[in-house]
């Protein structure tokens, strides 16, 4: 009896399935099915999205209908980019320059209300972009195959449009070139109190850099460089040579400032009787003549690395008022005209390698000598670095 009941149920189910397959809209029901059928190709989600993607001209037209773009950023050069965008497309642009920490906090507060004032933010703190904007759902998830063709990234939630750099620099007035040949000199008691950089508490990318030093890759390089400088293996009081470097740097009288500009003028004073080192934006190197200071760095000679490189993101915000203008701006920043405002920005490189740069070397030239950003590691370790710094200051 039980088997018969199951058989009846299966038969009924098969009948329903057949009826369902034959049914559909009314016009389809009146059309006789051919004796042989060919299965329709299954379209992937990516293919569906690609087919639905608007062309560049369509995006431009919709952006013009938006009529306005409001965005925040930390780099003053973005004002020139805003002006160029407005001139090219006839779209009103409202740009506000804010410090990175203040900017992220402002954006997060606006997005929490569901109606952000800004449409887009140009941010550089990888950790905060991931935790405060992407992780919270405030960043819009979208794709653009034209951007993918340039950057290789299929996800436009945070479009990388530039790579910026910071370098360990020194004043060559008393010592000449190649003086900063090994970063452990920063920790040497002979040079106590002669190193400066912007306080990590007010500069997220500096906190990111310190965190990256503790990853296995860079900690191993620091351990090797320690032996080269001090002539012996490093004795650890922390987990690895990266943590040890940060600890010894702070113990050696580091001067924390409020800006990269202050760092540059502090170490670059031509009247100093001792040689200072500093870590700050590479762009400051190009301002030394105007400021009457002396700066030097040796990117391909410093051990174990010469500085740090980090991405700059264009993030379109969910709930923004001018979505298409924001998407157009993010894409446009990768174009020749979009990056024109940064052609003289010393130490910055477009994520589009075809665009111009101000240094005598390319990004591919300098990248092997720099600590590089790793979002996954930063997500795992940055909070620990924050706690560590609190414990040693």
Walk through the language-model features, giving the residues of each.
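Short, low-complexity disordered leader/linker segments with a strong preference
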Residues: 1-66, 393
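Conserved C-terminal helix/tail region of periplasmic/extracytoplasmic solute-binding proteins
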Residues: 52, 364, 369-393
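Periplasmic-binding protein-like
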Residues: 150, 163-166, 245-249, 291-318
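Paired acidic/hydrophobic, glycine-rich loop segments that form the ligand-binding mouth/hinge
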Residues: 115-122, 256, 273-281, 296-297
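Mature extracytoplasmic/periplasmic domains
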Residues: 307-373
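A ligand-binding cleft/hinge motif common to bilobed small-molecule-binding domains
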Residues: 127-132, 275-296
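Short, polar/charged alpha-helical segment
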Residues: 53-64, 72-92, 168, 289, ...
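Extracytoplasmic ligand-binding site segments that recognize negatively charged/polar headgroups
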Residues: 72-83, 94-108, 116-268
